[in-house]
């Protein structure tokens, strides 16, 4: 993406916060990054999803990879040609080193244990969390949500340094963002529940889609339909600027503006490929791999005492 040319890629030990209001495409954005790292570059990616299940994420990956209609894929209403295309297009996902953990209400201490194991056993190169505000901190901060989020943010940065990997965490924005007039572009002060997030992050990027707010043209008179602005509001080691991307909503993915739309899908031999991805995933929350069956290999045994010492 053009974003890579601005950030010069993700730097080791960086904490990158990607924030936006609902329906801006936060999950699609980081899932696109995870897919590019795991499939195109064969780099290990750990994706901790506290909101969506692994099955839902895999479905999004299939839709983005094939370019097929999301409704058609979910319902299974595909032509034989489309089924052949789906099977062919999703084969790279089957061997991709992408590990998804969908444990809900994950504590930072459980997260640290799982991330360490994934680093040791699978040499992951990047960690993605969706999203920060759904994590829990330590008992000392219970009752004060701002302090708890500050503790979580600080801990995530410490873990990124310990494991020497870039860490991307999705974050919510305050509703006040939408109460402002004008373009309703997000600002650093809109980060929800803690100013510590801004302080701890090396990069803070906002996703903004003017089209969502009924703004049909930008300040230069260009149409905003299908466009997204990635606003680099903080960049510790580089310039702050805006990057325009195309948001392909139907395919739940982002692309460079100059990229053409995907060609019409051709498509898959039998429904077996769909079944393998859509219903063959583990039904219980835990860590699963697209390219390897991981079962509960990296789960924390809740009957044992969790190492809850702050990692810094």
Range-by-range predicted roles:
Residues 36-123, 137, 243, 265-266, ...:
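Cytosolic-facing regulatory segments adjacent to core modules
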Residues 24, 43, 67, 142, ...:
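Short, small/acidic-rich helices and loops at N termini and domain boundaries
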Residues 124-170:
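Helical hairpin unit composed of two closely spaced alpha helices linked by a short loop
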Residues 4, 8-52, 106, 111-120, ...:
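P-loop NTPase nucleotide-binding module
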Residues 2, 15-19, 29, 46-49, ...:
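Structured core elements
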Residues 107-124, 151-163, 176-312:
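C-terminal regions of RecA-like/P-loop NTPase motor modules
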């Amino acid at each position: 993406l053009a974003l890579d040319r601005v950030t010069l890629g993700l730097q080791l030990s960086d904490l990158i916060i990607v924030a936006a209001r609902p329906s801006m495409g936060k999950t699609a954005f980081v899932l696109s990054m995870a897919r590019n790292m795991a499939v195109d570059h064969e780099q290990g990616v750990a994706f901790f999803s506290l909101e969506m299940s692994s099955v839902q994420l895999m479905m999004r990956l299939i839709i983005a990879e094939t370019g097929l209609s999301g409704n058609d894929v979910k319902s299974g209403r595909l032509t034989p040609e489309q089924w052949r295309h789906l099977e062919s297009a999703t084969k790279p996902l089957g061997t991709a080193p992408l590990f998804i953990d969908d444990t809900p209400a994950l504590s930072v201490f459980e997260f640290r244990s799982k991330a360490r194991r994934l680093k040791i056993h699978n040499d992951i190169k990047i960690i993605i969390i969706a999203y920060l505000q759904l994590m829990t901190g330590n008992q000392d901060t219970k009752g004060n949500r701002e302090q708890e989020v500050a503790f979580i943010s600080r801990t995530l940065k410490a873990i990124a340094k310990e494991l020497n990997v870039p860490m991307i965490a999705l974050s919510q924005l305050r509703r006040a963002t939408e109460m402002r007039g004008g373009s309703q572009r997000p600002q650093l002060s809109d980060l929800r529940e803690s100013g510590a997030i801004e302080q701890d992050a090396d990069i803070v990027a906002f996703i903004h889609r003017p089209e969502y707010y009924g703004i049909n043209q930008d300040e230069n008179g260009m149409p905003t339909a299908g466009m997204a602005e990635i606003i680099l509001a903080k960049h510790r080691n580089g310039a702050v600027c805006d990057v325009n991307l195309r948001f392909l909503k139907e395919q739940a993915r982002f692309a460079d503006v100059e990229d053409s739309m995907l060609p019409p899908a051709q498509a898959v031999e039998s429904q077996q490929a769909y079944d393998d991805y859509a219903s063959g995933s583990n039904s219980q929350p835990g860590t699963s791999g697209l390219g390897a069956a991981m079962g509960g290999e990296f789960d924390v045994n809740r009957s044992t005492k969790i190492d809850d010492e702050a990692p810094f």
